[in-house]
Structure formats: structure tokens, C-alpha cells
């Protein structure tokens, strides 16, 4: 890989489990692995960073702070600096709402939080995207959910007063 051109840091960016099923490279173009999961501060709906898996095999994971993100291109994220090295067991302790079940007013599962639109400079989550089925399937609808509509958060699930997903706008 050659030199990657530096781009203006975007103000907003869509993040799939944050930018981050994408390929991660440093500014010199070196491959640093595939994005793995986002970590956040759920009570404030703020993205703090994400992790990458440098290799398909092995337990090692790298954790990146949001302020290390330099640019986002199609299926690629450019970072600056060194990641913190960790393992899967430690990553499991980092908080995230992504992939949590969304429970409605009747405590029934309406879908999952599968993505977020984030203001990259501050990490503020502007809204979550909810999918009823597997978000990797082509044609899967996504609904926009404002963080203010969440009533409660527990491990692996968030609760809202929604009756159904059709109460939300489609993304």
C-alpha cells in the first residue's frame, strides 16, 4: 500500500459498530486490522473509541481512542498514533449499547441497535439506527432512534416507550 492522503476530519460519520467493520490503516497506509467493536459511555450517549482485530487468529485486540481517527473513506478508517493492546476478555468489559436489544413498551423485542451516527469531534451520538433483522442482509430497513427516547439501559438491552418500530422515521 502506498501513502494515504490526509483528508479533513469529517464532522459527522456513520459508524457500523463504529467505523469499524472497516479496514483500519495508519497515515502511512499500513494495515492495522479490521474494526471489531465500539466502546462508549452509555449514560451520556458518547462514543469513546473502538477496537480492531489485527489478525483473524489470536486473542490480541487493539483499542483506539476517538481522537486518533484522522479520516474515513469507503470501507477504510485512517488513524494516527499507537493503539492500546488488550485481549477479548478485557474488551468484553467495555460498555457499549450497539448490538443491544431494543425493548418496547410491552417489553417485547422490537429490534437491535446496530449502528449510530456520531459527531466525530465530540463523540456525541446524534441517533442510533435500529434493525429488525440481521443488519448485514441487503435491503434491511433501519429506523432512526434519538437517544432521548431511551428510558433505561441494562446489559445487552435498552428500553423505550415505543409501541412498534414504525413509530420511528426510516433512515
What do the predicted segments below correspond to?
Residues 1-171:
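Peripheral interaction segments used for macromolecular assembly
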Amino acid at each position: 500500500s502506498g501513502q494515504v492522503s490526509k483528508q479533513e476530519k469529517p464532522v459527522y460519520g456513520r459508524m457500523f459498530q463504529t467505523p469499524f467493520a472497516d479496514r483500519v490503516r495508519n497515515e502511512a497506509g499500513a494495515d492495522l486490522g479490521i474494526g471489531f467493536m465500539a466502546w462508549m459511555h452509555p449514560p451520556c450517549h458518547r462514543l469513546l473509541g473502538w477496537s480492531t482485530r489485527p489478525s483473524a487468529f489470536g486473542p490480541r485486540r487493539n483499542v483506539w481512542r476517538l481522537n486518533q481517527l484522522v479520516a474515513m473513506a469507503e470501507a477504510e478508517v485512517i488513524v494516527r498514533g499507537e493503539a492500546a493492546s488488550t485481549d477479548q476478555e478485557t474488551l468484553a468489559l467495555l460498555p457499549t449499547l450497539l448490538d443491544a436489544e431494543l425493548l418496547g413498551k410491552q417489553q417485547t423485542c422490537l429490534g437491535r441497535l446496530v449502528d449510530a451516527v456520531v459527531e466525530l469531534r465530540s463523540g456525541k451520538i446524534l441517533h442510533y439506527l435500529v434493525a429488525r433483522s440481521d443488519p448485514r442482509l441487503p435491503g434491511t430497513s433501519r429506523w432512526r432512534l434519538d437517544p432521548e427516547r431511551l428510558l433505561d439501559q441494562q446489559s445487552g438491552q435498552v428500553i423505550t416507550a415505543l409501541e412498534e418500530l414504525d413509530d420511528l422515521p426510516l433512515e
